[in-house]
């Protein structure tokens, strides 16, 4: 993650954070450096750009789910993630806001116990239901704008399958690839994460 922000490597605005940045990029980070690296990176970005940071964390629970069958490894990951997330998301003055997604329901116990002001929205919540994918109107406009209005029902049959709150939405990745490839029907979304913890 740090290597994606190479502009920080010689930033005159980082002060003592420059040493942390270089330790992480050089592979010399301590466990503490790693557990606080997201908070520290957000601070570095604010110092460099002069703006608060938005943190987006997708599949926050992926490594925990993968280690579910190994209690010792699972606990190590839970302990690390508790520090990693709480330092990044609580009391971080460089943070504007954060969005965290995952398979497991976010609970104020466990790894999020250190956080307050936590707003949890799940697939049944109406508040952001239209923001989890493309709506019917958006897909129709996209297809019409790409001279493919006759493909609307086909796209609905293949890629409309999610319901958040009270709205049916399309998988954006699938729709983008479908349109980009000349409306060629295919399974564009590959499930790369494990949901074994839910299956149990």
Per-segment meaning from a language model:
Residues 1-200:
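Phosphate-binding site recognition
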